[in-house]
Design a protein with these regions (language model features):
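N-terminal alpha/beta PP-like core and its mobile active-site loop of ThDP/TPP-dependent enzymes
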Residues: 1-197
Length: 197
């Protein structure tokens, strides 16, 4: 680690490069930090919305010997993987849904990652709302379900794409409004109130 920051041969600021695209980037400089850093990396990568983490092992950490102490990460101060629910926002969303004349539910992979397929089915059936799925959300709702209108987006079905521009309330569940789904944001669902879970 004595050469870090000296522009040494093949030195790359991997942490600096990857911070904008990873949930957490960290450089391990001592072998004794490997166990807790790996535990923290797995915790962060798999909590909230899953995403990549980066661990950069300095040469010291690779060659030093240390006693391995298994560790488990269950909490990180100031890290909030899932924000608290705002009760007023939930009430406002429920009112929009209850008063909607032409609602549409957009289903993404987050439903599957959260193992919420059954809750989704109950929700759309109880409210009698049609649903369209993103490519990665296709298996969240059976294709033969009467409220499943098919895949959304530029490679999707005509029906749900037309419905996004006719609905009065758009409920997005477990999806991120990727450009493959929305296309031109200037014209996408401008008439709708949007609820994003």
């Amino acid at each position: 680690t004595g050469f870090l920051g000296t522009d040494a041969f093949q030195e790359v600021d991997l942490v600096g490069i990857t911070q904008p695209i990873a949930k957490w980037s960290y450089q391990i400089r001592r072998a004794e930090d490997v166990a807790w850093a790996i535990a923290r990396a797995f915790y962060i990568a798999s909590s909230g919305r899953p995403g990549p983490v980066v661990l950069d092992f300095a040469k010291n950490a690779q060659v030093e010997k240390t006693k391995y102490e298994p560790t488990k990460q269950e909490f990180i101060r100031s890290y909030v993987p899932v924000p608290d629910t705002d009760e007023e926002s939930v009430k406002a969303a429920a009112e929009l849904i209850n008063n909607a004349e032409r609602p549409l539910v957009l289903v993404g992979q987050g439903v599957e990652l959260g193992s919420a397929q059954e809750e989704l089915r109950i929700f759309i059936e109880k409210a009698d709302m049609p649903a369209g799925c993103t490519l990665l959300g296709l298996s969240a709702l059976p294709t033969d379900h009467p409220l499943n209108k098919g895949m959304l987006g530029m490679h999707g079905n005509l029906g749900p794409n037309i419905n996004t521009n006719k609905c009065d309330v758009l409920i997005a569940v477990g999806m991120r409004f990727d450009d493959r789904v929305t296309g031109n944001l200037a014209t996408y669902a401008k008439q709708a109130k949007v609820i994003h879970f």
